[in-house]
Structure formats: structure tokens, C-alpha cells
């Protein structure tokens, strides 16, 4: 007979991810996601202005920091999604960070 999968809440905590080092809560993740648009726009503003070493250095620093933030947002959403792929909230988080990533790479394709 097939075993029925347990709900995440039924699992021993030692077998559950602690994602709080990345984001304290889903609400904290949402706030970081909302702030991402302004950061993408600020990095996209470098388009056509990479003509000297100082500006290029600033651009590289800004894109490196932005990529770190996107990676953290993505990892959190992906792991929340992987906890239970049936959950609509996690599916939404995963879809939205993927959409933001597309926005980022589009903005940086100059």
C-alpha cells in the first residue's frame, strides 16, 4: 500500500529547513521583493554611461550586490516552493521572483 505524504507541519522540526537566516518571514521576503524594482532601475541607469573606470567599477559593484539580493530572494522562494509544490503562496512567490529575474536580465542587456 502506498504511503500518504505527511504535511510539512507534521514532520519533526529537525527535518525542516530553517530559512530565517535568509528572511525572517514571508513578509520580509515580500518587502525585499518590492524594493527590487527601484534597485533594478538604478542599475539600468548605467546604460550608455560605461565610459570610464570609475563608472564601470560602480556599475560592477551595483550589479554584484543586486545579483546577491536576487539570488537570496530566489533561493528562499525556491525552497519555500520545494517544501510543498501544492501551496499557492509558494507557487506565487516562485513565479514572481522568476519574473523579477527576467526584468533584471532584460534591464542589464545593454
For the regions a language model picked out, list residue spans one by one.
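N-terminal helix-rich structural modules
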Residues: 1-110
Amino acid at each position: 500500500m502506498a504511503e500518504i505524504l505527511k504535511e510539512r507541519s507534521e514532520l519533526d522540526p529537525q527535518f525542516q529547513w530553517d530559512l530565517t537566516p535568509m528572511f525572517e518571514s514571508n513578509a520580509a521576503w515580500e518587502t525585499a521583493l518590492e524594493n527590487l524594482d527601484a534597485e533594478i532601475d538604478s542599475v539600468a541607469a548605467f546604460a550608455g554611461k560605461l565610459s570610464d573606470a570609475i563608472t564601470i567599477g560602480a556599475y560592477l559593484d551595483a550589479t554584484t550586490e543586486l545579483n546577491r539580493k536576487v539570488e537570496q530572494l530566489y533561493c528562499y522562494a525556491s525552497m519555500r516552493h520545494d517544501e510543498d509544490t501544492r501551496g499557492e503562496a509558494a507557487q506565487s512567490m516562485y513565479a514572481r521572483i522568476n519574473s523579477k529575474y527576467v526584468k533584471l536580465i532584460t534591464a542589464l542587456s545593454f
